[in-house]
Amino acid sequence: IWHPYTSTLTPLTCYPVTNADGVYLELEGGNRIIDGMSSWWSTIHGYNHPVLNEAAHSQIDKVSHVMFGGITHQPAIDLCKKLLKLAPDNLEHVFLADSGSVAVEVSLKMALQFWHAKGQPRSKFLTLRDGYHGDTFAAMSVTDPDNSMHSLYKGFLPEHIFADSPKTGFWDEWNPSDIDSFREKLSA
């Protein structure tokens, strides 16, 4: 297997997982580690969650997967209805994507299509330095080209506008000057 973020010539060590429960991954040999990445942010409720397991078992016996190209299914409809109840009233549509990278990719395409439909085609995005948006081509283009694992692709990706990222810590009081760079780039 050619795993992500490693070379085929000098591959990084991969640790075989034999079980997963809650936040823990059990490795071959019995060691347990905390999955701080939540399997690339896809298991935010933990592994082996009884409600999610039951839903998956129930669904797999009916329909494992269908594409949304002209067809749909009730679980997707039900999920979208629940999401819309949580959303502000002016948000009336839900687009389901199969990964964060694809969600970013589709969002960028939607923004481009929006301006094209208004007769004002645009091709640049304003984004923050030190951000990460995924591994698909367009998602990499709005990820910091200098300070990220995608710096190898600088010069090959479309160039966008990068503002300094805010420096206020997560628990600190917000400092409005943190987004001065963003304001300057936006008004340029």
Predicted regions and their residues:
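N-terminal glycine-rich, Lys/His-bearing helix-loop that initiates the first secondary-structure elements
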Residues: 1-93
